[in-house]
Amino acid sequence: MDDKVRWTVSQKILLALTLICFFGFIIYLVVCWNQIPERLVSKYNAGGEVVRYSKKAFTLVPMMMIESILFVIITIISFFPAAVANTNATKYIQDDLNSYKKSALERIRLLTRTIILISDLLFVNLFNTIFLSMIYSGGVLVQHRVTLYSIIGFTVLFAASILFYYFRLRQIMKGHSR
């Protein structure tokens, strides 16, 4: 059986947005490196007071490497949704496979790729938000709230995506189990 899963337009758009956000932020860091303060806030106490500062190279470079590794891994995984979507539907794949079950398996793999791409986009933007909050944490309370709300928003979107995936997968499996 051919494990190739076609790419939908929305998946291509998600991948393009993720690439733009990822490489756009790297370009932003390179261009604005001299304008970034030498010391960045790296830790706050429970009262919201700055406890520790770090040099920008020791803060941004390792975090950028972590983001790059996560980005590459998640993007590679998105090219192989069959490896991730190892559901019970695969046990139906025999020599006498009919198109009904084949289409269910393809829909599961398409859905899996979409959720992986959404996760990739959310993680890249979450890291970028954290970077920006570290760079521009000049004691502006509004900025800290925006960062907090952004992180909460990304978390809610990620949880909603996972729930959507779960319920959609159950619907597909229920409609194709005989």
PLM regions and their residue ranges:
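Alpha-helical transmembrane segments and their helix-start/interface "positive-inside/aromatic belt" motifs
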Residues: 5-21, 61-63, 106-115
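Alpha-helical transmembrane segments and their immediate juxtamembrane interface regions
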Residues: 57-61, 105, 129, 135-178
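Active-site and channel-lining beta-strand-loop segments
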Residues: 29-61
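Juxtamembrane inter-helical linkers in multi-pass membrane proteins
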Residues: 84-103, 176-178
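Hydrophobic alpha-helical membrane-insertion segments
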Residues: 16-27, 67-75, 112-122
